[in-house]
Swiss-Prot record:
Keywords: Calmodulin-binding, Cytoplasm, Cytoskeleton, Golgi apparatus, Lipoprotein, Palmitate, Phosphoprotein. Palmitoylated. Palmitoylation enhances association with microtubules. Transmembrane segments: none annotated. It comes from Mus musculus. InterPro entries: MAP6. The keyword Phosphoprotein applies. This is MAP6 domain-containing protein 1. Belongs to the STOP family. The gene is Map6d1. Residues 31-106 are annotated as: Disordered. It comes from the Eukaryota. The modification Phosphoserine is found at residues 38, 41, 160. The lineage of its organism: Eukaryota, Metazoa, Chordata, Craniata, Vertebrata. One of its GO terms (biological process) is microtubule cytoskeleton organization. Interacts with calmodulin. GO terms for cellular component: cis-Golgi network; Golgi-associated vesicle; microtubule.
Length: 191
């Protein structure tokens, strides 16, 4: 008989290569590195650094899949490590690039309500494949049992324990299977 899979690590290792970006809860970011998906030749990189509008057009034309975090909370982030996205930001009033200082717009994502197909699309594969373990025993009660305290005197707290110390009396009863002999003999009635 095989041991049960306790930690589910074997399941994670088996499906690790099947993960897509929506299964990662927190968007992963690489600071200071170029995007691995946008590997270009050295000449193109120098042109894109010099002219941010051309690189921005290339970036916006490519479809970027949203992560589960972005789907749930509507967060739109710039690509990790792209220097062009940082250069395209407006630099405020009187900026060096002469761009207009428009206030940044905030987008709010509203979760779909009532559509069953949209709810299935919004969940990840692990949420769809979840099954509760069967055959698990319920845990024992953690309720503490009441302890009985035997006191030897009724005065309560005594500041001098040596003077009033009494050894608790220990009574041992021998087991007696017959209940008849445990009581005194009945007295005869005088009529």
């Amino acid at each position: 008989m095989a041991w049960p899979c306790i930690s589910r690590l074997c399941c994670l290792a088996r499906r690790w290569n099947q993960l897509d970006r929506s299964d990662v809860a927190v968007p992963l970011t690489l600071h200071g590195y170029s995007d691995p998906g946008s590997e270009e030749s050295g000449a193109d990189c120098s042109v894109s650094r010099g002219n941010p509008s051309v690189a921005g057009a290339r970036e916006s034309s490519r479809a970027v899949p949203l992560t589960q975090y972005q789907r749930d909370f509507g967060v739109r982030t710039a690509r990790a490590g792209s220097r062009d996205a940082a250069q395209e930001r407006p630099s405020g009033p009187g900026g060096r690039r002469g761009q207009s200082s428009a206030p940044p717009t905030r987008t709010v994502y509203v979760l779909p309500v009532g559509d069953a197909d949209a709810a299935v699309v919004a969940t990840t594969s692990y949420r769809q494949e979840f099954q509760a373990w069967t055959g698990v025993k319920p845990s024992r009660s953690t309720k503490a049992r009441t302890a009985r305290v035997v006191t030897t005197h009724s005065s309560g707290w005594d500041p001098s324990p040596g003077a009033s110390f009494q050894v608790p009396e220990v009574r041992k009863f021998t087991p007696n299977p017959s209940a008849i002999f445990q009581t005194s003999a009945p007295q005869t009635l005088n009529v």
